[in-house]
């Protein structure tokens, strides 16, 4: 429940202590990184940023249910998924700093570059999952999308394809109640966003997106279903975007109230999960204080390193990390762009 107490022990996943602590520590790192990134941007030290505050459980619960061989086709509000699955905070900061190297994932981390075009992650996920099915690699591809993103055509195209061919896809709608400044009640006439799965003929479920364990259970069931060859599942994580859409807006002065934010703040998932861990004897207030100090030091050190790199990259780097080897078309585009830049100089 909202106080971190297990309501139904039969539904509680039997996760090892190490996994539960990794979930919590990732959430604490993600929350603090969000807060600091907003500060860096306001100080003119970062181009822009899309914070994840309030959506940690929805992201980490899904990520924890994935196997190492599985793929993510991420949206731009996906910090905690990236961190949990092995991407570096340095890469995330580089990306929002404007350095293309931020899109280069560590070796063995099966995460695609961030999708800025809303809805595009659905088609990419469907195609990647279909390739996995054809190659019999036992991989599942997961993607998340915001409530506003479900109004975009590519969301439907990708899921319809995946459903038709039973491609191993798990789709998670992070329903954070706001599509920039449009409330979800004005963006869709559906009682829930989960029920959009009816049209695809696939299983669907609405989950408390602030309950990390509920998100894990729903995601694990969906991953297992996809891995068995039963096709996609649509999960709606009912949650709330505590921060602005990006650093370019100010929600409370434009389109929502402080009272609304305060009500959702009472449901904070990190405090909820912390209480759960303390009740299980896995965590303490002393350890929590130490973690906060370590996390803040890590964030500050990481951003100093990012600033030392700057935003400059070699032109070739933009082209050579799309495929294992550059295709003839990419090589041609690289040479063409190189000549253009030389002409500009």
From Swiss-Prot:
Pfam families: E1_dh. Keywords: Oxidoreductase, Pyruvate, Thiamine pyrophosphate. GO terms for biological process: branched-chain amino acid catabolic process. GO terms for molecular function: pyruvate dehydrogenase (acetyl-transferring) activity. It catalyses: N(6)-[(R)-lipoyl]-L-lysyl-[protein] + pyruvate + H(+) = N(6)-[(R)-S(8)-acetyldihydrolipoyl]-L-lysyl-[protein] + CO2. InterPro entries: Alpha-ketoacid_DH_E1_comp, DH_E1, PdhA/BkdA, THDP-binding. Its EC number is 1.2.4.1. The keyword Oxidoreductase applies. The pyruvate dehydrogenase complex catalyzes the overall conversion of pyruvate to acetyl-CoA and CO(2). It contains multiple copies of three enzymatic components: pyruvate dehydrogenase (E1), dihydrolipoamide acetyltransferase (E2) and lipoamide dehydrogenase (E3). Heterodimer of an alpha and a beta chain. This is Pyruvate dehydrogenase E1 component subunit alpha. It comes from Acholeplasma laidlawii. The lineage of its organism: Bacteria, Bacillati, Mycoplasmatota, Mollicutes, Acholeplasmatales. The gene is pdhA.
């Amino acid at each position: 429940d909202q106080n971190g107490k297990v309501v139904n022990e039969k539904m509680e996943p039997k996760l090892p202590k190490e996994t539960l602590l990794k979930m919590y520590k990732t959430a604490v790192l993600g929350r603090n990184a969000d807060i600091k990134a907003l500060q860096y941007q306001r100080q003119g030290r970062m181009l822009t940023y899309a914070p994840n505050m309030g959506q940690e459980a929805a992201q980490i619960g899904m990520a924890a249910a994935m196997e190492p061989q599985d793929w993510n086709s991420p949206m731009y509000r996906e910090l905690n998924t990236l961190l949990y699955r092995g991407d570096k905070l340095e890469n995330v900061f580089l990306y929002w700093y404007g350095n293309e190297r931020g899109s280069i994932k560590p070796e063995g981390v099966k995460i695609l570059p961030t999708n800025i075009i809303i809805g595009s992650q659905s088609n990419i996920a469907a195609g990647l999952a279909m390739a996995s099915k054809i190659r019999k690699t036992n991989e599942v591809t997961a993607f998340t999308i915001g409530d506003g993103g479900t109004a975009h055509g590519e969301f439907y195209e990708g899921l319809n394809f995946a459903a038709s061919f039973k491609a191993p896809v798990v789709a998670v709608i992070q329903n954070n109640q706001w599509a920039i400044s449009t409330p979800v009640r004005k963006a869709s006439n559906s009682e829930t966003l989960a029920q959009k799965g009816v049209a695809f003929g696939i299983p669907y479920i609405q989950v408390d997106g602030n309950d990390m364990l509920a998100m894990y259970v729903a995601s694990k069931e969906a991953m297992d279903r996809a891995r068995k060859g039963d096709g996609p599942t649509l999960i709606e994580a009912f949650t709330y975007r505590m921060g602005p859409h990006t650093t370019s807006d100010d929600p409370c002065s434009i389109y929502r109230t402080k009272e609304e934010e305060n009500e959702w703040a009472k449901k904070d998932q990190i405090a909820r999960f912390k209480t759960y861990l303390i009740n299980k004897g896995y965590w303490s207030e002393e350890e929590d204080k130490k973690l906060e100090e370590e996390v803040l030091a890590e964030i500050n050190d990481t951003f100093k390193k990012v600033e030392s790199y700057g935003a400059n990259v070699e032109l070739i780097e933009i082209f050579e990390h799309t495929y294992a080897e550059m295709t003839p078309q990419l090589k041609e585009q690289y040479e063409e762009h190189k000549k253009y830049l030389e002409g500009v100089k």
